[in-house]
């Protein structure tokens, strides 16, 4: 724990090595990481290395009760894994309850020595973590929401590398992140959306950004003045400073929310400063810097246009290995729902019409087990732990983006999809209008996937499949299901283990918006899950 003050609120927060945000890990493609975690806080905790493929090292993936039991207070665990075939910006964070509000940091993977970037070498590289600050304890926030059945209280500020900037009350220039640049130099900004519950627009006043990478996968470079980045996603962008010192030497860097939710959200703008060397921006000047032009908070069209710009390099050195044929097709309806008010607080529940908020895929709200699914799978002890019958499509189809059905109640279960090794998979993720259509950033553990198609309205297999991009689709580990729309992804199930796929809005994850893939061993020794480490935490 460390004492941190933001917005005139001083509190003790969980940290890694006393740092908020946590320490930067810099490795090279091919390195093996050995990270010993000792839990000195009162909560259980686990850590996830977000975007690392964990090839045959699922025991190190980190989601609580999926690949391991939590590290108890006073306990420790060694995460050991090798970075295989990946380079770029990823990140690490706690994967238990809402602890990742302060337990997060960058994970930078450099190319092997002697291998250049497929874009101009930058003068400097700068990790930029976009987060949320809660004056209250985030653990108390989600606990209260789950008790009452309503939505959680929203954050009090957005942050750049843990700093909220000058636009908030009781936030000084000392709480403002400053990026100092030299004229004519190019900087690689390694953007990470570490916010708990908000997709964010990002921009730099009077500067154009060149997007070169997404989720540690190179993309065909494209220019943009406003970006959108979802929780869990990373984005590498090049910023070139003006060749000569401009008349004004300080420029606002801003983030603001993108949302279509019908509920409350943190509708504030956080500011950092791009400062040319030699400038000295006063506190008063910081507050009056012109902001970059960002889309309106609900501008889904701007988000769609930006998202459509991403294409893989698809070069000889970095090919796009898109599955052309598919062994198994899945259609997941993704959205909110409700539970009956069986445990009222003060006689009522605070969800819609005296219900409790829930979330689901194919109307199954995921129930977190009390033991590790990977351990149960390795020991083949499934009874009472999981059911291998997650539905491949909704049991009762409906007009997903039209008038919602009258019955909004969800079912519950720890249900998984079993896959044979090397199965090629296509998943269509369809947003629903139940309790309001909204974007859902879905993250798949253990894999990258290709985003082969997207659109608005209800997915139509007879027409939409023909529009797929099977040449140079972007490769990601986290993708937002468009508001009132759909997205199609493909991957090859060549990594044995149990891999959760979940919404990276933590409130939706808390309400059950997740499922898991159980990928069986292949026939060869290098296609099998190794035994668990001797120090893996036990649940009982």
UniProtKB/Swiss-Prot annotation:
Binds 4 Cu cations per monomer. The keyword DNA-binding does not apply. GO terms for cellular component: apoplast. Cu cation 3 binds at residues 95, 445, 502. Its EC number is 1.10.3.2. It is found in: Secreted, Extracellular space, Apoplast. Its main location: secreted. Keywords: Apoplast, Copper, Lignin degradation, Metal-binding, Oxidoreductase, Repeat, Secreted. Pfam families: Cu-oxidase (PF00394), Cu-oxidase_2 (PF07731), Cu-oxidase_3 (PF07732). Cu cation 4 binds at residues 440, 503, 508. Cu cation 2 binds at residues 50, 93, 504. GO terms for molecular function: copper ion binding; hydroquinone:oxygen oxidoreductase activity; oxidoreductase activity. One of its GO terms (biological process) is lignin catabolic process. Lignin degradation and detoxification of lignin-derived products. PANTHER family: LACCASE-11-RELATED, MULTI-COPPER OXIDASE. This is Putative laccase-11. It comes from Oryza sativa subsp. japonica (Rice). The gene is LAC11.
């Amino acid at each position: 724990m460390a004492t941190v003050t933001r917005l005139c609120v001083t509190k003790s927060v969980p940290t890694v090595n006393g740092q908020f945000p946590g320490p930067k890990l810099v490795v090279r493609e091919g390195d093996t990481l050995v990270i010993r975690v000792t839990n000195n806080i009162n909560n259980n905790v686990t850590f996830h290395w977000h975007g690392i493929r964990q090839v045959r090292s699922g025991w190190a993936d980190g989601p609580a009760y999926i690949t391991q039991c939590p590290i108890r207070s006073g306990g420790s665990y060694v995460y050991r894994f090798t970075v295989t075939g990946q380079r770029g910006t990823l990140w690490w964070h706690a994967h238990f309850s809402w602890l990742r509000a302060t337990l997060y940091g960058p994970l930078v993977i450099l190319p092997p020595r002697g291998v250049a970037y497929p874009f101009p070498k930058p003068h400097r590289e700068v990790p930029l973590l976009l987060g949320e600050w809660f004056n209250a304890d985030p653990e108390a926030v989600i606990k209260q929401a789950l008790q009452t059945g309503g939505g959680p209280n929203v954050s009090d500020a957005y942050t750049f590398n843990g700093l909220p900037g000058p636009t908030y009350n009781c936030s000084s220039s000392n709480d403002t992140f400053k990026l100092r640049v030299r004229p004519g130099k190019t900087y690689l900004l390694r953007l990470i959306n570490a916010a708990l519950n908000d997709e964010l627009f990002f921009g730099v006043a009077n500067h154009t950004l060149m997007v070169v990478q997404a989720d540690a996968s190179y993309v065909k470079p494209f220019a943009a003045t406003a970006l959108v980045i979802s929780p869990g996603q990373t984005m590498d962008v090049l910023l070139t400073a003006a060749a000569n010192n401009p008349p004004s030497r300080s420029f606002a860097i801003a983030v603001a929310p993108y949302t279509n939710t019908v509920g409350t959200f943190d509708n504030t703008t956080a500011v950092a400063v791009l400062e040319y060397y030699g400038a000295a921006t006063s506190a008063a000047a910081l507050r009056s810097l012109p902001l970059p032009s960002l889309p309106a908070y609900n501008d889904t069209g701007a988000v769609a246009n930006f998202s459509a710009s991403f294409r893989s390099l698809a070069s000889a050195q970095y090919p796009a290995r898109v599955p052309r044929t598919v062994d198994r097709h899945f259609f997941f309806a993704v959205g909110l729902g409700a539970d009956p008010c069986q445990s009222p607080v003060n006689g009522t529940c605070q969800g819609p019409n005296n219900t409790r908020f829930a979330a689901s895929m194919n109307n199954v709200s995921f129930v977190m087990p009390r033991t590790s699914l990977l351990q149960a799978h390795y020991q083949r002890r499934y009874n009472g732990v999981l059911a291998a019958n997650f539905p491949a499509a909704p049991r009762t189809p409906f007009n997903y983006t039209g008038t919602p059905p009258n019955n909004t109640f969800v079912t519950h279960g720890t249900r998984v999809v079993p896959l044979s090794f090397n199965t090629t998979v296509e998943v269509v993720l369809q947003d629903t209008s139940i309790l309001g259509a909204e974007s859902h950033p879905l993250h798949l553990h253990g894999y990258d996937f290709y985003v082969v198609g997207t659109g608005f309205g209800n997915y139509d297999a007879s027409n939409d499949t023909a529009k797929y991009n099977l040449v140079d689709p972007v490769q990601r580990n986290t993708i937002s299901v468009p508001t009132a729309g759909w997205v199609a992804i493909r991957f090859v199930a060549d990594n044995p283990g149990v891999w959760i796929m979940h919404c990276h809005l933590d409130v939706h994850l808390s309400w059950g918006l997740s499922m898991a893939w159980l990928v069986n061993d292949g026939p060869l020794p290098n296609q099998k899950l190794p035994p668990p480490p001797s120090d893996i935490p036990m649940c009982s």
